[in-house]
């Protein structure tokens, strides 16, 4: 919205500042953080009253989790309120990439909201049907993938690039759509599986958002993209503003989600944020780098896949409990040890992922 003021820059010179992505990214970050800080208590109190018993606690989970009973969920509403309001104010609304990323985030968030609603009302960890949920997620993601492919310059817009190898580019043609949809849905559900302890998911999400904000800015700048020999994707620099809003909203949410959490993110937030990261990775042509930067989320998702698959084949479990953060709790790690150590892993993986920009 503020980009509109640049039309009057000839008469009011200070309005030129809104042309700069870096300035608007900082503004988006501060704005979303303030929105969550200011409206967070009201939203939390409202959810606590409406939800009553709050998010149900898994009966087979660590004993320390039972003291969290009664904590409200759907904290993603706070996060998305901050992100959407901030993006409407600071982002360039003429960018198709901004709208696609927000569409996926809102769509996935709506699915998560319905899932959270069913869990709270039924007081059960059985929410939305898994098949129906995945079906709707893939539909939303496929529409987004098609839009991204058409918005770019073919055949590159439907191609897959690889880190470390600058010349290796594979044109997926129409197979790009199912591949990109898989990345978006996979990212959304991987973040969802990570969100099991106070503060565990939101910090790695912010780390990944900061990393991809940097990647988006570089990918959308012809000079930087040429210097680093990464693929130039016009218009994706604007996604740095969106991810700046994610970081700000994440900081605001962490204030209330710090242990002992006053509210849980819920599927409302985790699916929305994960889907957003996956969509940005697809738009910037850094899908494989997402698996590195978001390696913590990949590890959490793989632990569940391995646990379920191995149990179905042998009747035995690989981990004491899945996702893997619960395994370490069962091994005797305190919740704070698991959370902080996983944060460290997320930061290290982000640095490795960012190093791929230069190591080509």
Curated annotation (Swiss-Prot):
Membrane topology value: Multi-pass membrane protein
Record bears the keyword rRNA-binding: no
Catalytic reaction list: UDP-N-acetyl-alpha-D-muramoyl-L-alanyl-gamma-D-glutamyl-meso-2,6-diaminopimeloyl-D-alanyl-D-alanine + di-trans,octa-cis-undecaprenyl phosphate = di-trans,octa-cis-undecaprenyl diphospho-N-acetyl-alpha-D-muramoyl-L-alanyl-D-glutamyl-meso-2,6-diaminopimeloyl-D-alanyl-D-alanine + UMP
Cellular localisation: Cell inner membrane
BP GO annotations: cell division; cell wall organization; peptidoglycan biosynthetic process; regulation of cell shape
Keyword Mitochondrion in record: no
Cofactor names: Mg(2+)
Signal peptide: none
GO cellular component, one term: plasma membrane
TM stretches of this protein: 27-47, 71-91, 93-113, 128-148, 168-188, 199-219, 239-259, 262-282, 288-308, 337-357
EC number: 2.7.8.13
GO MF annotations in UniProt: metal ion binding; phospho-N-acetylmuramoyl-pentapeptide-transferase activity; UDP-N-acetylmuramoyl-L-alanyl-D-glutamyl-meso-2,6-diaminopimelyl-D-alanyl-D-alanine:undecaprenyl-phosphate transferase activity
Pathway entry: Cell wall biogenesis; peptidoglycan biosynthesis
Record's keyword terms, sorted: Cell cycle, Cell division, Cell inner membrane, Cell membrane, Cell shape, Cell wall biogenesis/degradation, Magnesium, Membrane, Metal-binding, Peptidoglycan synthesis, Transferase, Transmembrane, Transmembrane helix
Function comment: Catalyzes the initial step of the lipid cycle reactions in the biosynthesis of the cell wall peptidoglycan: transfers peptidoglycan precursor phospho-MurNAc-pentapeptide from UDP-MurNAc-pentapeptide onto the lipid carrier undecaprenyl phosphate, yielding undecaprenyl-pyrophosphoryl-MurNAc-pentapeptide, known as lipid I.
Protein name: Phospho-N-acetylmuramoyl-pentapeptide-transferase
Organism: Brucella canis (strain ATCC 23365 / NCTC 10854 / RM-666)
Encoding gene, per UniProt annotation: mraY
């Amino acid at each position: 919205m503020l980009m509109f003021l640049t039309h009057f820059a000839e008469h009011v010179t200070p309005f030129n500042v809104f042309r700069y992505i870096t300035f608007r990214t900082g503004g988006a970050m501060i704005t979303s953080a303030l929105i969550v800080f200011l409206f967070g208590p009201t939203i939390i109190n409202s959810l606590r009253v409406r939800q009553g018993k709050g998010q149900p606690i898994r009966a087979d989970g660590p004993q320390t989790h039972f003291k969290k009973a009664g904590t409200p969920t759907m904290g993603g509403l706070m996060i998305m309120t901050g992100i959407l309001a901030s993006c409407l104010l600071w982002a360039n609304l003429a960018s198709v990439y901004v709208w696609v990323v927000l569409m996926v985030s809102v769509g996935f968030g709506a699915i998560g909201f319905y899932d959270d609603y069913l869990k709270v009302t039924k007081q059960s960890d059985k929410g939305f049907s898994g098949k129906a949920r995945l079906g709707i997620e893939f539909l939303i993601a496929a529409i987004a993938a098609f839009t991204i492919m058409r918005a770019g310059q073919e055949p590159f817009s439907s191609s897959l690039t690889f880190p470390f190898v600058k010349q290796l580019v594979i044109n997926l043609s129409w197979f790009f759509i199912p591949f990109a949809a898989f990345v978006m849905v996979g990212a959304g559900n991987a973040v969802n599986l990570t969100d099991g302890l106070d503060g565990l998911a939101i910090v790695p999400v912010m780390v990944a958002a900061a990393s991809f904000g940097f990647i988006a800015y570089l990918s959308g700048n012809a000079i930087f993209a040429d210097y680093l020999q990464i693929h130039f994707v016009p218009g994706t620099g604007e996604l740095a503003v969106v991810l700046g809003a994610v970081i700000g909203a994440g900081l605001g949410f962490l204030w209330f989600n710090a242990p002992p959490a006053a509210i849980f993110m819920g599927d409302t937030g985790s699916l929305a944020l994960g889907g957003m990261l996956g969509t940005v990775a697809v738009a910037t042509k850094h899908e494989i780098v997402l698996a590195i930067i978001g390696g913590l989320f990949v590890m959490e998702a793989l632990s569940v896949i391995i646990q379920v698959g191995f149990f179905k084949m042998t009747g035995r479990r690989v981990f004491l409990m899945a996702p893997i953060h619960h395994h370490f709790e069962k091994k005797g790690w305190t919740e704070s040890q698991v959370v902080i150590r996983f944060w460290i892993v997320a930061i290290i993986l982000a640095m490795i992922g960012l190093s791929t920009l230069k190591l080509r």
